[in-house]
């Protein structure tokens, strides 16, 4: 919290710097006119009391001075100066509730307050709102949004100082403009007005498309919608990952989070290699464009489950060979699954641990007779007797599909077991011939 307030104080000093000149001029005019009470709605004594408060350097003492002034002159025309002094003092005292209270009182004076002063106190109000606890932010969300919009309007009305070029003035207004839009976005978020938050965050991105935090926050807003807008959420998370302003640690952290969200969106059972491929494709797209292409999409867990419902190894072969979007969706659904009793013709057997069988997938006698080239390799684990499988024999195995090559078409299986009935029985060891004893020679007797 102390770090936040230190930053608030620095930013507020910058904001108030734009209005100090005009306020000083107005005070000077007030002092000159204050000597003639028929021309000014306050007395010189009243003016001097306000000036004494303005000169006070200790915030708590200044607040006491201002309290005494307001108690004595509750309807003073000098409140247009007194209320902003409260704002500055309470900011130094790290009291956001009072900053907000007196900023609102200043703005409530309407056109009596010049645009520069209104901008300054509304800027301070926005910074103070950011330091409130969540419950207080939620309670004050509607007023915070109104104040942010009023701040943008006041900032637009601030006249360029004579000593600044148009470009320099435009640059000075950029940070306050972003702050007001950010306040609008956060207030909309806590009020569960997610479309409103999207609008405010996008206003920031229109000024700074590469901003890490804004892209990330916008992704979170899309994810919080009902139903979640997953493609937009993924897109803006990816924009945050690829932000040129992100450190390596920040980029890695958001990338890890994005990957986990994609995996969850697809049911958590998609092969890691496929999730990595989808992530890399998304990052490449997001790194080259601020806006998500309407054609960009990822299959959901529901899409994948629908494919798996009626999927067989035969349909997997057909769909993968066909290529295109159907092939991609089928592979997402099939990769990592265990398929039972896959039929095939053994083309080659490589003993070892694991045993590797090269098999041609067949579904008919005609295909079996014609098969001479394998289109699958099958790693058999924990079944040493499978080494007895003979070349050109028919087998069935149950295994996990782990990879495939589109050209030439080839499937890769792991953790497989061959159907016991398809493994030839172990040949019995040949029996030893019986030992023949030599016939006893007849006795000579």
Where are these regions (language model features)?
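Structural motif corresponding to the intra-repeat A-B loop/turn of tetratricopeptide repeats
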Residues: 56, 93, 132-134, 138, ...
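Short solvent-exposed coil/turn linkers within tandem alpha-helical repeat scaffolds
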Residues: 72-80, 108-118, 135, 155-176, ...
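Residue-level recognition of tetratricopeptide repeat
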Residues: 88, 123-129, 186, 220-221
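Pro/Ala/Gly-rich low-complexity, hydrophilic intrinsically disordered segments
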Residues: 152-159, 257-258, 264-332, 417-445
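OB-fold single-stranded nucleic acid-binding module
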Residues: 307-310, 314, 328, 347-441
């Amino acid at each position: 919290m102390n770090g936040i307030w230190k930053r608030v104080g620095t930013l507020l000093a910058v904001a108030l710097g734009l209005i100090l000149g005009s306020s000083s001029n107005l005070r000077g005019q007030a002092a000159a006119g204050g000597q003639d009470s028929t021309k000014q709605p306050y007395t010189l004594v009243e003016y001097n009391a306000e000036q004494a408060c303005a000169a006070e350097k200790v915030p708590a003492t200044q607040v006491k001075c201002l309290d005494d002034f307001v108690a004595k002159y509750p309807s003073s025309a000098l409140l247009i100066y007194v209320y902003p002094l409260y704002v500055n003092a309470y900011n130094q005292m790290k009291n956001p509730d009072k900053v907000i209270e007196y900023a609102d009182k200043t703005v409530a004076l309407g056109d009596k307050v010049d645009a520069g002063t209104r901008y300054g106190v509304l800027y301070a109000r926005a910074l103070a709102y950011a330091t409130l606890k969540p419950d207080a932010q939620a309670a004050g969300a509607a007023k915070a949004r109104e104040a942010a919009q009023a701040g943008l309007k006041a900032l637009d009305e601030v006249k360029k100082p004579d000593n600044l070029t148009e470009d320099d003035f435009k640059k000075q207004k950029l940070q306050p403009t972003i702050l007001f839009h950010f306040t609008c976005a956060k207030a909309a978020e806590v009020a569960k007005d997610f479309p409103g938050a999207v609008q405010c965050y996008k206003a920031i991105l229109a000024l700074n498309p590469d901003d890490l935090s804004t892209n990330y926050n916008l992704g979170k807003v899309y994810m919080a919608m009902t139903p979640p807008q997953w493609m937009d959420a993924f897109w803006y998370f990816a924009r945050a990952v690829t932000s040129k302003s992100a450190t390596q640690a920040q980029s890695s952290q958001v990338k890890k989070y994005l990957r986990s969200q994609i995996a969850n969106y697809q049911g958590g059972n998609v092969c890691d290699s496929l999730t990595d491929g989808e992530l890399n494709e998304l990052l490449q797209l997001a790194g080259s464009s601020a806006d998500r292409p309407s054609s960009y999409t990822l299959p959901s867990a529901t899409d994948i489950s629908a494919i798996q419902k009626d999927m067989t190894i035969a349909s997997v072969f057909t769909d993968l060979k066909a290529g295109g979007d159907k092939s991609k969706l089928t592979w997402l659904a099939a990769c990592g699954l265990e398929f039972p009793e896959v039929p095939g013709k053994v083309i080659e057997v490589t003993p070892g641990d694991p045993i590797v069988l090269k098999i041609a997938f067949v579904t008919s006698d005609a295909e079996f007779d014609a098969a001479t080239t394998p289109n699958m390799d099958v790693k058999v684990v924990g079944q040493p007797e499978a080494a007895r499988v003979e070349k050109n024999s028919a087998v069935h195995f149950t295994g996990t599909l782990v990879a495939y090559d589109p050209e030439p078409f080839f499937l890769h299986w792991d953790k497989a077991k061959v159907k016991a009935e398809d493994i030839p029985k172990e040949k019995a060891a040949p029996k030893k011939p019986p030992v023949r004893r030599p016939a006893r020679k007849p006795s000579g007797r």
